[in-house]
Structure formats: C-alpha cells, structure tokens
Amino acid sequence: MSGSIDIASIGRGSEIAVVGTGPTGLVAALALGKVGTSVIALGPAPQNPASAPVETRTAALFASSVDLLKRLEVWDGLKSEAAPVKVIRIIDASKSLLRAPDIEFKASDLGLGAFGYNISNAALVAVLYARASKVLPQVIEANVEAIAIDRSKVLLALSDGAEVTARLLVGADGRRSICRKSAGISTSERPYDQAAIASSFRHGRLHQGVSTELHKENGSVTTVPLPDPHASSLIWVGPRSEIAQLTQLDAGLFEEELNARLGGLLGPISGLGARAEFPVTGLSADTLAANRTALVGEAAHILPPIGAQGLNLGFRDAAALADCVAVALRRDRDPGGDDVLASYRRARGLDILTRTLGVDLLNRSLLSQFLPLQAARGLVSHGLKALPPLRRLVMRLGLTPPSELPSLMRPGAG
C-alpha cells in the first residue's frame, strides 16, 4: 500500500482506472473503453495553449499507430497537424576509420505512401483528451496521491480528496510511476551520460518528407518533417556537458551550431522554436504486470530517442492490453486477474525486449571507439545499402513487432 485510504468512504468506481493523461495513457483509456468496459481516466488536463509554455516536441508515429488512432476516431482531428515521413536517411558523420555509408530507407520500397506521420505532442494530447472526455464515463482532472491494492480491487486516493476503486489499474504515469511502485514492481536502469534537446526550426530547402539521422562519435542530430515544407522538428543528442552548453546559447548562436552540424543539408536555418532539454536514459520494469496493475509506455520502458521507437512501443502496449481485456470480458473473467496480467506479459514481452536491446546496442555502438564494433556496424550498413531485400526486411522489422500486431492496429481492422 502507498499512502492511506479509508476504504469505507469510496464512492466512485470502474472496472478499469488508467492513471496518466499523456498520449499513451489516453490511448490506453480509449482502447480499453472501445472493447466494452467502463474506464476512468485520471490525470491533469492539457494546459490551455494561450497560457502554456510553447511546446515544440513532436512524435513520429508509425503507420500502425496511425491505424490505431483511426480506430479510436481521433485521426480526422489530427491529420491536418501531421507531416508524412516518406524517407529516413541515415548519415554517418563520424571520423571513424571504418565509416558507414549513408543509407536511405524509402517507404515506397514497401509499397507505402509514408512510414508514418510526425505530429505535435500538444496537438496529439489535446485531441485525445477531448475524445476521452466525450466517450469515457469519467475523466477526472486530479493526480493520484495514494494507492492500495487488495485481492479484489485497487483503491486510489486523489489530490481533489476523492477516492475511486477499480479491478484493473493501468499505469501510464511515466518514469516515476506511482502505479509501478504501489504494485511492488522494480526497475532496471541503463545510464548513458547523455542528454537531448528537442526543438523545431525553419530551413531554406524543402524537406520533401525526409527525416535525417546524422550520427557523430558522441551523439546524433535527427530532423523530422513538419507540415510546413520549410520546417522540421529536431532532436539533438550528445554528452550532458555539451547539451547543457547548447541550451544556454542564444537562438542565433544555436542556429549557427545546428547549421554547422547539418553541413547545410537543409539550407539556411532560422526561426528556432523553444528548446526543451531532457536526460537520455534507459529503463525497463522488471515485469509488465503484477498485483492488478498493468504498465504501459514509459512506466514500463524508456528508450533513447533513436528510431522513433518509444511512443509507438507504448501505443502497442495499450492496444495489446485492450486485446487481453477483451478476451477476459468475453469469458466473463476478472479484467485485473492474474490470467489477464500473464496474457499481457506474454503479448508484449518479445516486442519490448527486442526494441530495448536493439536501441541500446545501436546507441552504444555509435558511442563506442572499439574498432571491431565500428567494423561490424559499417559492414551491416554496407549490406543494407547494397542489398534491397535486406533493406526491406529491416524496414519491416523496424515498423512492426516480431509478434502479431494488436487487433486495433491491424490494417483494415474494424
């Protein structure tokens, strides 16, 4: 038990309580609501754009994540804010003796119009929250301050003084998850001594739907198209000391540094957006589900910002959990029972493990000065460049999990 709750005073209840109103939590609440059970979403409402700090962070969503948003009936409100990513370009700008060749992955090689879409985090959360407020029984604008779990239910005390109960608790409350702590789930962390800057900028040349990952010895710069053809979002990863210095530069000097790092790839740079600095870490929950609690998104796993895996992984968590609960409902079973939690662990384990290991290995290989590792990375890159079938296979593996997609994410699903 975390905190103290008067069980006798609880008045509001639901089959499922989802804690966290970020993108993954809202998607989880909507997906679970769609399978026919009562869901309460708990967390703060999005800030009013007029009073909130400028938010320039974006999310690159794969096609399967977009399909999920369509099933949840929110994509129509988002597509005008989204930019298609048609090409992913990887550039090795290191000074390695065994430098890897530049590679372009094209969605058209898979018969796709785009790998996915890049969209503002603020727009994504606003549309999801509006939909949740419309279709869910309750969306409570309060934080969870204490949680107690017994054999048949989960009890939550909220910051507004209210108390609620549910049979399944979904923890979508991020890296410092109170849900994870209350369920007694420990974590393993992977420090990288890196930080990142998220921002946006304007550029003289058209981006043409191309996302570029430019890798150097100590980090990377990734640009992702925005709806304006002369604007892109930015993730700059580097040593903590370097990122701290870059954050302190005025806009003009930062633009000069960015232009130098990109080598004029997108033409003259201007119109730098607000910059947000965040640590680059890796985190894995030691189990995805226990004690009537299922973890999704960053409560379960945190990855370095490479390959746009993080949020897409969280969306697959949410959709897979909805599948597991749907099976339980058809069989008239407890949605928070041990069999449902075990089913969720099986459904998500391999996908999360392969993505976590893959991103960790790639990040460490980019930082390593060990010549055999550099040689291996260069050899793989040469193979990808020279062998189209291998390149197509890698693209498919990057976009979809090794196991079957959850039902709400399958193309053509109802």
Language model: regions and residue ranges:
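C-terminal helical "tail/cap" subdomain of flavin- and related membrane-associated enzymes
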Residues: 323-414
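N-terminal FAD cofactor-binding segment of flavoenzymes
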Residues: 55-94
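Conserved FAD-binding catalytic core of PHBH/FMO-like flavoproteins
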Residues: 69, 162-163, 168-267, 273-275, ...
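Glycine-rich FAD pyrophosphate-binding loop
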Residues: 33-56
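Conserved Rossmann-like nucleotide-cofactor binding loop
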Residues: 24, 47, 176
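N-terminal Rossmann-like FAD-binding beta1-loop-alpha1 element of flavoenzymes
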Residues: 15-41
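Conserved N-terminal helical subregion
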Residues: 5, 9-13, 81-182, 190-195
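FAD/FMN-dependent oxidoreductases across multiple families
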Residues: 244-329, 333-336
